[in-house]
Amino acid sequence: VKDANLVNSLSGKVAGVTINASSSGVGGASKVVMRGTKGIDQSSNALYVIDGVPMFNLSGEGGQEFDSKGASEAIADINPEDIESMSVLTGAAAAALYGSHAANGAIVITTKKGKEGRLSLTVSQNTEFLRPFVTPKFQNSYGTGDLLSSSGSVERSWGNKLNSSNYMGYDPISDFLRTGVVATETVSLSTGTEKNQTYFSASAVNSVGMVPNNDYDRYNFTFRNTTSFLNDKMTLDVSASYIKQKDQNMVNQGTYSNPLVTAYLFPRGDDWNEVKMYERWDTSRNIYTQYWPQGIDTFTGQNPYWIAYRNLRENNKDRYMLSASLNYKILDWLSVSGRVRVDNSNSTYTEKLYATSNTTLTEGSNNGLYGISTTADKQTYADLMLNINKNFGENFTLQANIGASLSDMQQNVLQNRGPISEDGIPNVFNVFQLDDTKTKRTQSGFHDQTQSLFASVELGYKSTYYLTLTGRSDWPSQLAGPNSTQSAFLYPSVGGSVI
């Protein structure tokens, strides 16, 4: 079954690569670790390289103790149907070509392009159904209460022993979770002549999660054209992609506002059907209020359905990628190439906690909480390389790459988040309703640039013995300050292999 996140398709197929799929569901960030974790407090994730150009896989911040915000990532936006092949690059070769970002290894992705011949139209559809496979085990022998008594707690299940007359038969898997569905449709077109090839694809991913009111939608549009000039000595390759994504209530594990916590711990002696109607009309306030007779007690719990339908978190993202590469073959064994790639995205994240949500989560407000943040990511990469691939006699081969690159990354985040003021209107979500004394208005971001020179030389003998030399020097902007004692760092390597 094809996965909507192309990274997950590598699971179990590459030796030494561990892939942990996201607990947030479709669109969530997956962790890829090659040959073990490299550090305690730093990411061990691999670098992704698409058609020879690094893609710096920025991901959103996950949820915190009182903030359930699932995290997505840039690589999860890519349409798996546009992928021609994937390979894994580790060691000094990865670091020499792509810098310190590839210290944990690199996943090299080659995308599809048009093929010479008749017009080809491909239509594919994939539907996946999701149900829990491994779930926690809970006792169902004792009812609501504590210490074998019906008193002491309204949220625990250590009360009197249940029997056939008072056991409600509650099961969180069948009673709360639903069958998830992931539907993927793709249409692709390929056509070309000997001198010009064109590829176009459009794809839609629509997912309904297992947790109620958790949805994910993504739409991809990709265009690529490859043209040869000057008796096939020069090749121009251009591509453009646009991605529109929306996710709602992406679940984050281990937080108090995760609906699974109270769904799992719901007292076995209580009636689940009673709390399915998660809100009641309050005539004194003229609003619907949360119904959760179990209370908050020790783990800041809420009605799971209230969390799903009245603690709303929505993320909307627009992303476009433009790239171009030009290759000129000077001699049969010598060529020069240049590449440039622009990858920009704009995201808007909104958070709406309705009135009577737990006041620990709404920062003390009985009228609700509202948050909105906008994030703009801009990535630009360019490189120029001299490529050598030459045979010397019958026994010796030489492969070398010598070049320079520039990587520029920017991020700007604007955020407004705070409780609705006590004299405000409940459940009216805009920044004018927020309590000025408690609202957090922040602006953050960064602008990093790295300029590099690199070289990789591999000498082969009889297609059996190989000697590899690599070297790279980076000039990162982080070392450009007046107090820096070093403006660049060099990392060379020497390696050998026998096949």
List the predicted regions and their residue ranges.
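Short, small/polar-rich motifs associated with maturation and membrane association
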Residues: 1-223, 228-229, 234-238, 321, ...
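Surface-exposed loop/interface segments of Gram-negative outer-membrane beta-barrel transport/assembly proteins
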Residues: 23, 42-45, 50, 61, ...
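Extracytoplasmic/periplasmic beta-strand context in beta-sandwich domains
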Residues: 30-32, 105, 400, 488, ...
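Alpha-helical support elements that line or immediately flank enzyme active sites
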Residues: 65-66, 322-328, 342-344
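Extended, hydrophobic alpha-helical segments in both membrane/secreted and soluble proteins
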Residues: 83, 221-223, 338, 382, ...
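Residues on the lipid-exposed face of transmembrane beta-strands in outer-membrane beta-barrel proteins
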Residues: 111, 187-193, 223-227, 324-328, ...
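Repeated loop/turn-to-beta-strand initiation elements of outer-membrane beta-barrel proteins
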Residues: 195-198, 232-236, 333-336, 396, ...
